[in-house]
């Protein structure tokens, strides 16, 4: 927990993507001119999208795949394969050894990010665009009592039918958190 708090308290845009922190702060505070925004967007798209290499480094330095696989807890992610044009609902046991970092990074790829192929040559993006609250995945796996932590980001939210003996608890913010790539709120 302390490590996560330290990462969050030191979070800057540039620790997640190759951008200028001051420019990004000015953008989110509405201080950038439209012409400057359009010029920056043009540059980013000419370069193939926003580079997430800093996030890959952050994941590599802080995620211990062996500990995650050996912790005795189930761990699920949802990505969307751009290569195969389908949603992937994966448990950690479905992910080949040594590839968890790739899939965690894919969970952070949004439209507009430079999407580097994963180890198998395929390209995935965050599954939240198609299933923002994948509680249905857990119900399909047999879970009956769920705690859903919400951030109210963009994306589709499929309806979930819990079993009769199931309960869903939702935890969500009372205030708007800002953009999903805004870190100083």
Region roles according to the model:
Residues 2-185:
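Patatin-like phospholipase
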